[in-house]
From Swiss-Prot:
Gene that this sequence comes from: dnc-2
Any one GO BP annotation for this protein: establishment of mitotic spindle orientation
Name this polypeptide is given: Probable dynactin subunit 2
UniProt xrefs under PANTHER family: DYNACTIN SUBUNIT
Keyword entries, A-Z: Coiled coil, Cytoplasm, Cytoskeleton, Dynein, Membrane, Microtubule
C-alpha cells in the first residue's frame, strides 16, 4: 500500500493505455485520513532556514522500494540581489549576497577567459575575498560584531608597485633639491642594508662578536705556545712542501686513473683472448702432426701395395705365359 492508502499498480509494456479516472478526493478537513496539527512558526523557521525544497531526486510513487526520501537540502541557496533600478536602501545582507554573486561571476569569467587574469585579479584573490564575505555573513547571522582577523593575502605586486612609486617620488625630490649624488640602489636594498647596520650596532650582537674574537685569539695563542714548546724542526716546511707536491702528483694520477684502469682492463681482455687463441693454435698443431703421421703411414702403405702389386702382376704374367705355352703344345 502507498503512503496515501492506495494500491501500487505496475503495468507491463503491452498493457492497454487506458487510464481509469480516479475519484476526486474529499478535501473536507473532517475526513478521517486528514490529521490536523499545529505548527510552531519560529521552530519551523529555525529548522528549515536557508533550505530549498528539491524533488528532483525523490520518488514518492513507489512505497515498496526502501528509499530515503529527503526532499529538503541545503546544497542550493538563493541570493537576494537588488537591481540597478531599486530605489530603496540596500541592507547589509543584500550587499554581502551581491558581493558573493559578483565574485562568483568573476570566477566564471576568469575560468572562461585566461587573458582576464592579472596580478591583482586572480582565483587566489577572489577566494580570499569570498572567505572574508562568508566570515562577515557568519558574524552577522550570529549577531556579533567581532572583528575579522583574517587579512586578504594580495600578491607582492601591490607592494612592489608601492615601492616603485616611492622610489619615483624620492628620485623627483632628489632632483628638485639638487642632490650631488643620486643613489642607484633600490629602496628595498637600502632598507635591508640599514637593518643589517642597525643589527651590528646592537649591544648583544657586538658582545657576541667580541666573545668570538676573544676565543679565536686564545686559540691562536695556544697554537703559538704549542709550536714554541714542541721545537718544530726546520725541515718540517720542506717535508710539508714535499707532501704537497706528492699530493699534487697524486691528484694528476687520480685524474688519469679511470682511463688507466680502462686500459688495464682492455689489456687483460686482450691477454685472455691471446691465451685462448694460443690454446686453439696448439690444438691445431697437434692435429696437424697427427695428420702428417697418418699421411706418411698412408704413403708407406701405398708404396708397399705398389711393390706387392708389381710382384703379383709379374707372377700372373709368367703364369699366363706358361698357360699360353701349354695351350700351344696342346694344339
Amino acid at each position: 500500500m502507498s503512503s496515501i492508502g492506495k494500491e501500487d499498480i505496475y503495468e507491463s509494456d503491452g498493457a492497454a493505455s487506458q487510464v481509469q479516472k480516479s475519484e476526486p478526493e474529499n478535501d473536507n478537513p473532517t475526513h478521517p485520513d486528514i490529521e490536523l496539527i499545529s505548527v510552531d512558526v519560529d521552530e519551523a523557521l529555525k529548522k528549515y532556514k536557508n533550505r530549498v525544497l528539491n524533488l528532483t531526486s525523490s520518488d514518492f510513487s513507489d512505497s515498496i522500494a526502501k528509499k530515503r526520501r529527503h526532499a529538503f537540502g541545503n546544497n542550493q541557496y538563493v541570493l537576494e540581489v537588488t537591481g540597478a533600478g531599486f530605489s530603496g536602501t540596500e541592507t547589509a545582507a543584500e550587499k554581502l549576497n551581491r558581493i558573493l554573486y559578483e565574485v562568483a561571476d568573476l570566477n566564471e569569467q576568469i575560468r572562461a577567459d585566461e587573458n582576464l587574469k592579472t596580478d591583482l585579479l586572480n582565483a587566489e584573490v577572489l577566494e580570499n575575498l569570498e572567505k572574508e564575505v562568508k566570515t562577515l555573513q557568519v558574524a552577522q547571522s550570529n549577531g556579533k560584531t567581532a572583528r575579522v582577523e583574517h587579512d586578504v593575502e594580495l600578491p607582492n605586486v601591490r607592494t612592489d608597485s608601492k615601492v616603485a612609486t616611492l622610489e619615483n617620488r624620492l628620485r623627483r625630490i632628489e632632483q628638485v633639491i639638487g642632490s650631488s649624488v643620486i643613489p642607484s640602489a633600490p629602496v628595498l636594498d637600502t632598507i635591508e642594508d640599514l637593518k643589517l647596520r642597525c643589527e651590528t650596532l646592537n649591544h648583544s650582537y657586538v658582545s657576541g662578536l667580541e666573545q668570538r674574537l676573544n676565543m679565536m685569539l686564545t686559540k691562536l695563542e695556544k697554537i703559538d705556545e704549542t709550536r714554541a714548546n714542541n721545537d718544530i724542526d726546520e725541515n718540517l716546511d720542506k717535508k710539508v712542501d714535499e707532501i704537497l707536491e706528492l699530493m699534487q702528483k697524486w691528484d694528476v694520477a687520480c685524474s688519469s686513473l679511470p682511463s688507466n684502469v680502462n686500459k688495464v682492463k682492455a689489456l687483460n681482455r686482450l691477454h685472455e683472448q691471446v691465451q685462448h687463441f694460443a690454446g686453439g693454435l696448439s690444438h691445431l698443431k697437434t692435429i696437424r702432426e697427427k695428420l702428417e703421421k697418418e699421411v706418411a703411414q698412408g704413403r708407406e702403405a701405398i708404396i708397399e701395395y705398389e711393390s706387392q702389386g708389381k710382384q703379383e702382376i709379374g707372377s700372373v704374367v709368367e703364369k699366363l705365359k706358361l698357360l699360353e705355352a701349354k695351350v700351344a703344345d696342346l694344339k
